[in-house]
Amino acid sequence: MSAADLTAPAAVPPLEQQGDAKLRSQVRSAVIWRSGTQVFSQLVAWGSTFMVIRILSPADYGLFAMTSVVLVLFGLLNGYGFANAAIAQRDGGKDQLRQLFGLLIVVNVGLTVLQILLAPLVAAYYRQPIIADLLRVQALIYLTNPFQALGYAVLSRAMDFRRQAQVNVVSALLSAATALGCALSGLGVWTLVAAPFVMFASRALGTITAARAWMWPSFNFRGARALAGYGGTIMAGQIFWFMQTQADIIVAGRTFAPHELGFYTTALFLSQIVLNLRIGREGDLVERRHHFGHEDLG
Protein backbone atom coordinates (compact mmCIF):
# COMPACT_ATOMS: atom_id res chain seq x y z
CA MET A 1 0.00 0.00 0.00
CA SER A 2 1.46 3.34 -1.02
CA ALA A 3 1.74 6.46 1.13
CA ALA A 4 -0.84 8.09 -1.12
CA ASP A 5 -3.32 5.35 -0.25
CA LEU A 6 -2.75 5.91 3.49
CA THR A 7 -3.32 9.64 3.29
CA ALA A 8 -6.29 9.49 0.90
CA PRO A 9 -9.63 10.47 2.49
CA ALA A 10 -12.18 7.74 3.03
CA ALA A 11 -14.76 7.42 0.29
CA VAL A 12 -17.95 9.31 1.11
CA PRO A 13 -21.19 7.72 -0.08
CA PRO A 14 -23.06 9.81 -2.61
CA LEU A 15 -25.74 12.09 -1.17
CA GLU A 16 -28.40 10.04 -2.94
CA GLN A 17 -27.26 6.86 -1.14
CA GLN A 18 -27.13 8.66 2.22
CA GLY A 19 -30.65 9.98 1.72
CA ASP A 20 -31.95 6.57 0.68
CA ALA A 21 -30.41 4.91 3.76
CA LYS A 22 -31.97 7.56 6.00
CA LEU A 23 -35.36 7.04 4.41
CA ARG A 24 -35.13 3.25 4.83
CA SER A 25 -34.37 3.82 8.50
CA GLN A 26 -37.43 6.09 8.79
CA VAL A 27 -39.63 3.46 7.16
CA ARG A 28 -38.36 0.70 9.49
CA SER A 29 -38.96 2.88 12.52
CA ALA A 30 -42.43 3.80 11.28
CA VAL A 31 -43.40 0.16 10.72
CA ILE A 32 -42.30 -0.77 14.25
CA TRP A 33 -44.11 2.14 15.88
CA ARG A 34 -47.31 1.85 13.91
CA SER A 35 -47.55 -1.93 14.05
CA GLY A 36 -46.74 -2.24 17.73
CA THR A 37 -48.87 0.63 18.98
CA GLN A 38 -51.83 -0.24 16.78
CA VAL A 39 -51.88 -3.80 18.11
CA PHE A 40 -51.63 -2.45 21.66
CA SER A 41 -54.41 0.10 21.05
CA GLN A 42 -56.71 -2.54 19.61
CA LEU A 43 -56.04 -4.88 22.53
CA VAL A 44 -56.94 -2.05 24.92
CA ALA A 45 -60.12 -1.33 22.95
CA TRP A 46 -61.09 -5.00 22.87
CA GLY A 47 -60.41 -5.41 26.59
CA SER A 48 -62.67 -2.49 27.49
CA THR A 49 -65.28 -3.71 24.99
CA PHE A 50 -65.43 -7.16 26.58
CA MET A 51 -65.91 -5.61 30.02
CA VAL A 52 -68.53 -3.13 28.81
CA ILE A 53 -70.46 -5.86 26.96
CA ARG A 54 -71.01 -7.53 30.33
CA ILE A 55 -72.53 -4.32 31.72
CA LEU A 56 -74.61 -2.82 28.92
CA SER A 57 -77.75 -4.41 27.50
CA PRO A 58 -78.09 -5.76 23.95
CA ALA A 59 -80.63 -2.99 23.27
CA ASP A 60 -77.91 -0.39 23.91
CA TYR A 61 -75.76 -1.94 21.21
CA GLY A 62 -78.74 -2.17 18.89
CA LEU A 63 -79.49 1.55 19.23
CA PHE A 64 -75.85 2.41 18.68
CA ALA A 65 -75.75 0.23 15.56
CA MET A 66 -78.66 2.22 14.12
CA THR A 67 -76.78 5.49 14.57
CA SER A 68 -73.53 3.98 13.31
CA VAL A 69 -74.91 3.75 9.78
CA VAL A 70 -75.01 7.54 9.59
CA LEU A 71 -71.66 7.88 11.35
CA VAL A 72 -69.94 5.48 8.96
CA LEU A 73 -71.38 7.22 5.89
CA PHE A 74 -70.45 10.71 7.04
CA GLY A 75 -67.10 9.40 8.26
CA LEU A 76 -66.28 8.55 4.65
CA LEU A 77 -67.06 12.15 3.68
CA ASN A 78 -65.10 13.87 6.44
CA GLY A 79 -62.29 15.13 4.20
CA TYR A 80 -59.44 12.77 5.02
CA GLY A 81 -59.02 12.29 1.29
CA PHE A 82 -58.05 15.98 1.09
CA ALA A 83 -55.41 15.38 3.76
CA ASN A 84 -53.97 12.47 1.75
CA ALA A 85 -53.78 14.73 -1.29
CA ALA A 86 -51.84 17.31 0.73
CA ILE A 87 -49.43 14.60 1.89
CA ALA A 88 -48.84 13.50 -1.70
CA GLN A 89 -48.12 17.12 -2.71
CA ARG A 90 -45.59 17.71 0.06
CA ASP A 91 -44.09 20.74 -1.71
CA GLY A 92 -47.36 22.66 -1.32
CA GLY A 93 -46.09 24.60 1.67
CA LYS A 94 -47.96 26.27 4.51
CA ASP A 95 -50.46 28.01 2.22
CA GLN A 96 -51.71 24.63 1.02
CA LEU A 97 -52.02 23.43 4.62
CA ARG A 98 -54.08 26.50 5.49
CA GLN A 99 -56.33 25.77 2.50
CA LEU A 100 -56.61 22.17 3.65
CA PHE A 101 -57.58 23.31 7.15
CA GLY A 102 -60.24 25.64 5.76
CA LEU A 103 -61.62 22.95 3.46
CA LEU A 104 -61.81 20.47 6.33
CA ILE A 105 -63.66 22.99 8.50
CA VAL A 106 -66.22 23.71 5.78
CA VAL A 107 -66.82 20.00 5.10
CA ASN A 108 -67.09 18.92 8.72
CA VAL A 109 -69.23 21.83 9.89
CA GLY A 110 -71.52 20.96 6.98
CA LEU A 111 -71.65 17.32 8.08
CA THR A 112 -72.41 18.38 11.65
CA VAL A 113 -75.33 20.56 10.59
CA LEU A 114 -76.61 17.95 8.13
CA GLN A 115 -76.59 15.17 10.73
CA ILE A 116 -78.48 17.34 13.22
CA LEU A 117 -81.11 18.09 10.58
CA LEU A 118 -81.41 14.44 9.52
CA ALA A 119 -81.58 13.09 13.08
CA PRO A 120 -85.41 13.19 13.38
CA LEU A 121 -85.80 11.49 9.99
CA VAL A 122 -83.43 8.68 10.92
CA ALA A 123 -85.23 8.24 14.25
CA ALA A 124 -88.55 8.03 12.42
CA TYR A 125 -87.15 5.43 10.00
CA TYR A 126 -86.00 3.18 12.86
CA ARG A 127 -89.07 4.04 15.00
CA GLN A 128 -86.79 4.87 17.94
CA PRO A 129 -87.13 8.50 19.19
CA ILE A 130 -83.90 8.33 21.20
CA ILE A 131 -81.94 7.94 17.95
CA ALA A 132 -82.48 11.65 17.24
CA ASP A 133 -80.83 12.67 20.52
CA LEU A 134 -77.95 10.27 20.01
CA LEU A 135 -77.24 11.56 16.51
CA ARG A 136 -77.33 15.21 17.60
CA VAL A 137 -74.66 14.59 20.22
CA GLN A 138 -72.59 12.32 17.97
CA ALA A 139 -72.52 15.08 15.34
CA LEU A 140 -70.03 16.96 17.54
CA ILE A 141 -67.40 14.35 16.65
CA TYR A 142 -67.04 15.86 13.17
CA LEU A 143 -65.77 19.11 14.68
CA THR A 144 -62.62 17.29 15.82
CA ASN A 145 -61.78 16.05 12.31
CA PRO A 146 -60.18 19.23 10.90
CA PHE A 147 -57.59 19.35 13.70
CA GLN A 148 -56.87 15.63 13.57
CA ALA A 149 -56.55 15.51 9.77
CA LEU A 150 -54.34 18.61 9.64
CA GLY A 151 -51.96 17.20 12.25
CA TYR A 152 -51.98 13.85 10.47
CA ALA A 153 -51.02 15.54 7.18
CA VAL A 154 -48.14 17.48 8.73
CA LEU A 155 -46.71 14.48 10.59
CA SER A 156 -47.09 12.18 7.58
CA ARG A 157 -45.30 14.66 5.33
CA ALA A 158 -42.40 14.52 7.78
CA MET A 159 -42.59 10.69 8.01
CA ASP A 160 -43.05 11.13 11.77
CA PHE A 161 -45.18 8.11 12.62
CA ARG A 162 -43.73 7.77 16.12
CA ARG A 163 -45.62 10.73 17.55
CA GLN A 164 -48.78 9.71 15.72
CA ALA A 165 -48.53 6.29 17.32
CA GLN A 166 -47.99 7.75 20.79
CA VAL A 167 -51.07 9.94 20.44
CA ASN A 168 -53.13 6.94 19.30
CA VAL A 169 -52.11 4.94 22.37
CA VAL A 170 -53.05 7.76 24.76
CA SER A 171 -56.41 8.31 23.04
CA ALA A 172 -57.17 4.57 23.16
CA LEU A 173 -56.47 4.47 26.90
CA LEU A 174 -58.64 7.53 27.55
CA SER A 175 -61.47 6.08 25.47
CA ALA A 176 -61.29 2.73 27.27
CA ALA A 177 -61.33 4.42 30.68
CA THR A 178 -64.30 6.56 29.63
CA ALA A 179 -66.24 3.54 28.37
CA LEU A 180 -65.70 1.56 31.54
CA GLY A 181 -66.45 4.52 33.80
CA CYS A 182 -69.66 5.46 31.98
CA ALA A 183 -70.86 1.85 31.88
CA LEU A 184 -70.29 1.40 35.61
CA SER A 185 -72.11 4.70 36.22
CA GLY A 186 -75.22 3.35 34.51
CA LEU A 187 -75.21 5.65 31.47
CA GLY A 188 -76.33 2.84 29.17
CA VAL A 189 -76.22 3.61 25.46
CA TRP A 190 -74.62 7.01 26.15
CA THR A 191 -71.50 5.08 27.09
CA LEU A 192 -71.13 4.19 23.41
CA VAL A 193 -71.42 7.88 22.53
CA ALA A 194 -69.04 9.27 25.15
CA ALA A 195 -66.15 6.85 24.59
CA PRO A 196 -65.68 7.54 20.84
CA PHE A 197 -66.03 11.29 21.43
CA VAL A 198 -63.24 11.22 24.02
CA MET A 199 -61.07 9.20 21.65
CA PHE A 200 -61.56 11.56 18.70
CA ALA A 201 -61.22 14.73 20.77
CA SER A 202 -58.04 13.59 22.52
CA ARG A 203 -56.56 12.33 19.26
CA ALA A 204 -57.31 15.62 17.53
CA LEU A 205 -55.73 17.68 20.31
CA GLY A 206 -52.75 15.36 20.60
CA THR A 207 -52.10 15.10 16.87
CA ILE A 208 -52.22 18.80 16.08
CA THR A 209 -50.11 19.59 19.16
CA ALA A 210 -47.50 16.96 18.27
CA ALA A 211 -47.36 18.33 14.72
CA ARG A 212 -47.15 21.94 15.98
CA ALA A 213 -49.65 22.73 13.26
CA TRP A 214 -51.56 25.55 14.92
CA MET A 215 -52.45 27.96 12.13
CA TRP A 216 -55.31 30.07 10.82
CA PRO A 217 -57.42 28.37 8.14
CA SER A 218 -57.73 29.83 4.68
CA PHE A 219 -61.13 29.88 3.02
CA ASN A 220 -59.69 31.09 -0.28
CA PHE A 221 -59.76 27.83 -2.20
CA ARG A 222 -58.23 29.18 -5.38
CA GLY A 223 -55.69 26.63 -6.57
CA ALA A 224 -57.07 23.88 -4.34
CA ARG A 225 -58.59 21.96 -7.23
CA ALA A 226 -56.04 19.16 -6.94
CA LEU A 227 -56.88 18.64 -3.26
CA ALA A 228 -60.60 18.54 -3.97
CA GLY A 229 -60.27 16.26 -6.99
CA TYR A 230 -58.06 13.70 -5.27
CA GLY A 231 -60.14 13.69 -2.11
CA GLY A 232 -63.40 13.48 -4.01
CA THR A 233 -62.23 10.46 -5.95
CA ILE A 234 -61.27 8.62 -2.76
CA MET A 235 -64.60 9.41 -1.11
CA ALA A 236 -66.59 8.30 -4.13
CA GLY A 237 -64.86 4.92 -4.14
CA GLN A 238 -65.57 4.40 -0.45
CA ILE A 239 -69.31 4.78 -0.96
CA PHE A 240 -69.40 1.30 -2.52
CA TRP A 241 -67.69 -0.13 0.57
CA PHE A 242 -70.35 1.56 2.72
CA MET A 243 -73.19 0.01 0.74
CA GLN A 244 -71.62 -3.44 1.05
CA THR A 245 -70.93 -3.31 4.79
CA GLN A 246 -73.91 -1.36 6.14
CA ALA A 247 -76.84 -2.68 4.10
CA ASP A 248 -77.64 -5.35 6.69
CA ILE A 249 -77.91 -2.78 9.51
CA ILE A 250 -80.11 -0.50 7.41
CA VAL A 251 -82.56 -3.34 6.75
CA ALA A 252 -82.34 -5.14 10.09
CA GLY A 253 -82.54 -1.92 12.10
CA ARG A 254 -86.04 -1.24 10.82
CA THR A 255 -87.18 -4.86 11.10
CA PHE A 256 -85.62 -6.06 14.36
CA ALA A 257 -86.13 -4.77 17.89
CA PRO A 258 -83.09 -2.96 19.37
CA HIS A 259 -82.09 -5.89 21.58
CA GLU A 260 -82.29 -8.31 18.63
CA LEU A 261 -80.12 -6.03 16.52
CA GLY A 262 -77.75 -5.73 19.47
CA PHE A 263 -77.31 -9.51 19.62
CA TYR A 264 -76.64 -9.55 15.87
CA THR A 265 -74.05 -6.76 15.83
CA THR A 266 -72.26 -8.08 18.93
CA ALA A 267 -72.08 -11.59 17.47
CA LEU A 268 -70.81 -10.13 14.19
CA PHE A 269 -68.12 -8.18 16.04
CA LEU A 270 -66.97 -11.25 17.97
CA SER A 271 -66.90 -13.44 14.87
CA GLN A 272 -64.74 -10.95 12.96
CA ILE A 273 -62.45 -9.91 15.78
CA VAL A 274 -59.35 -11.66 14.41
CA LEU A 275 -59.95 -10.39 10.89
CA ASN A 276 -60.18 -6.85 12.24
CA LEU A 277 -56.68 -7.01 13.71
CA ARG A 278 -54.79 -4.75 11.32
CA ILE A 279 -51.09 -4.81 12.05
CA GLY A 280 -50.12 -1.30 11.09
CA ARG A 281 -50.86 0.49 7.86
CA GLU A 282 -47.77 -0.25 5.85
CA GLY A 283 -49.58 0.94 2.74
CA ASP A 284 -49.32 4.46 4.11
CA LEU A 285 -45.59 4.03 4.57
CA VAL A 286 -45.08 2.75 1.05
CA GLU A 287 -47.10 5.67 -0.29
CA ARG A 288 -45.00 8.19 1.66
CA ARG A 289 -41.84 6.47 0.37
CA HIS A 290 -43.13 6.70 -3.19
CA HIS A 291 -43.85 10.42 -2.87
CA PHE A 292 -40.27 10.99 -1.74
CA GLY A 293 -39.19 9.97 -5.22
CA HIS A 294 -37.97 6.42 -4.67
CA GLU A 295 -39.16 3.20 -6.18
CA ASP A 296 -38.37 0.40 -3.75
CA LEU A 297 -37.97 -0.14 -0.03
CA GLY A 298 -34.58 -1.75 -0.43
Give the residues covered by each predicted segment.
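Interhelical loop/hinge segments that connect adjacent transmembrane helices in multipass membrane
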Residues: 2-23, 27, 162, 205-245, ...
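Membrane-water interface segments that mark the loop-to-transmembrane alpha-helix transition
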Residues: 14, 25-45, 67, 72, ...
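Residue-level signature of transmembrane alpha-helical cores of multipass secondary-active transporters
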Residues: 30-38, 68, 104, 137-138, ...
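Helix-loop junctions and terminal segments of transmembrane helices
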Residues: 77-94, 156-157, 267, 271-298
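Hydrophobic alpha-helical transmembrane segments
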Residues: 132-139, 167-213, 226-232, 260-271
